[in-house]
Design a protein with these regions (language model features):
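Cys-based phosphatases of the PTP/DUSP/CDC25 superfamily and their flanking regulatory architecture
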Residues: 1-298
Length: 298
C-alpha cells in the first residue's frame, strides 16, 4: 500500500504521455493512490495505533493555537530541507494570526494564488513601496515591488513585538481565471518554475550551514491549487537534481497524512501531469513556447 511509484526519466515520461491511453492511466493512478490512502486511514483508526492518535492530538493543538485558520498542514519539499505550509486565504479579522503563523514557522516565502480580481482578494500587506501596516503587534513594511507578466513579487520586512526583523518574499500569482476561463497548465507552470529558479539561485549564494525557511502557500479555491503548486514544485526540483521525476510520488507526499486538509480531485491530478509534460518538453528543448514563456517571466 505504501510502495512508491517508479521514477521516470525524461524520455520515459514523454513516452508515457504519448500513449493514447495516458489520460485513462493517469486517472486510474489517481484512484489507486486515493484508495490506498483510505485503506491506510482505516488501518490507522485501529485501537492499537496510538501513534496516529498522538499525531491527531498534536494537529488539534495546532488548530487551537490558530483557531481561525481553515486548515494548517506542512509538507516536505523534495530535498526534505524546505517545508510547504498550506492554509486557506486569511480573512481580515485573521491577519494577526496569519502573521503570527508566518513568524513562528520561520516563513521566508509566501505564495498567494488568487482566483479573484485583485481588489476582491485579501490584502494583508501593502502593495505600495515604503508603506507599512500593523497587524496584532506585527509590522509589515513593503520594501520593493516587482511586477511580472504572470505575478507580482514583493519584498516585505516583518517585525515582531520585540523589533526583531525578517525579510519575506511575497509572490502573488495574477494569471488565474476570473471569468470561468479554463486554467492553463502552461501559464501556471511558468509561475512555479520562476519561483523554483529564484530559490535555487538563492540557495547557491548561501553558506553551507544555511537552511531555507518555510514556504507558505494559500489560495481561495478550496486549496486545490495549493496542492497543485506543491506537487509541481516538488517535481521540478527533483528533475533538476536527478533528471527523473514522479508525479505520483509527489502527490502521495502531500496527501499521505491522514488529517491533511488539501482539497483535490482527479482533474487536479491530470492538470499536474499536463504541466509537467510541458516542463519536460521545454527542458529538452522541444517546446519553443516553453522557452519563450520562461524568458518572459524571468
Amino acid at each position: 500500500m505504501s510502495a512508491e511509484f517508479e521514477e521516470l526519466s525524461a524520455i520515459d515520461f514523454l513516452l508515457f504521455m504519448d500513449n493514447v491511453d495516458s489520460l485513462d492511466l493517469i486517472r486510474s493512478e489517481y484512484y489507486i493512490i486515493e484508495q490506498n490512502r483510505k485503506i491506510c486511514e482505516v488501518f490507522d483508526d485501529e485501537p492499537d495505533n496510538k501513534g496516529c492518535r498522538q499525531l491527531l492530538h498534536r494537529f488539534l493543538c495546532c488548530m487551537k493555537r490558530y483557531p481561525r485558520a481553515d486548515f494548517i498542514d506542512s509538507y516536505d519539499a523534495y530535498d526534505r530541507q524546505q517545508k510547504y505550509i498550506c492554509i486557506s486565504d486569511p480573512k481580515a479579522e485573521n491577519y494577526d494570526k496569519f502573521w503570527e503563523l508566518a513568524w513562528c514557522r520561520e516563513v521566508n516565502t509566501i505564495v498567494k494564488i488568487s482566483q479573484t480580481k485583485e481588489e476582491e482578494s485579501c490584502q494583508y500587506w501593502s502593495s505600495r513601496e515604503e508603506s507599512e501596516i500593523e497587524c496584532g503587534g506585527f509590522r509589515i513594511k513593503t520594501l520593493m515591488v516587482i511586477k511580472r507578466p504572470r505575478f507580482i513579487a514583493t519584498l516585505l520586512l516583518l517585525s515582531d513585538q520585540k523589533n526583531r526583523e525578517r525579510e519575506i518574499w511575497h509572490y502573488h500569482y495574477t494569471a488565474s481565471p476570473t471569468d470561468n476561463n479554463p486554467d492553463d497548465p502552461f501559464i501556471f507552470l511558468s509561475f512555479v518554475c520562476s519561483l523554483n529558479d529564484t530559490f535555487t539561485i538563492s540557495k547557491k549564494k548561501q553558506l553551507a550551514e544555511w537552511k531555507p525557511g518555510a514556504v507558505l502557500v494559500h489560495c481561495n479555491d478550496g486549496s486545490s491549487f495549493s496542492a497543485v503548486y506543491c506537487i509541481l514544485d516538488i517535481c521540478v526540483t527533483q528533475f533538476k537534481y536527478t533528471g527523473a521525476l514522479s508525479v505520483a510520488n509527489a502527490f502521495r507526499k502531500i496527501t499521505q497524512r491522514k488529517h491533511n486538509c488539501l482539497n483535490y480531485d482527479a482533474d487536479d491530478y491530470s492538470f499536474c501531469y499536463q504541466a509537467i509534460h510541458m516542463y519536460v518538453l521545454g527542458e529538452l528543448g522541444l517546446s519553443q513556447k516553453y522557452l519563450d514563456e520562461r524568458e518572459l517571466t524571468r
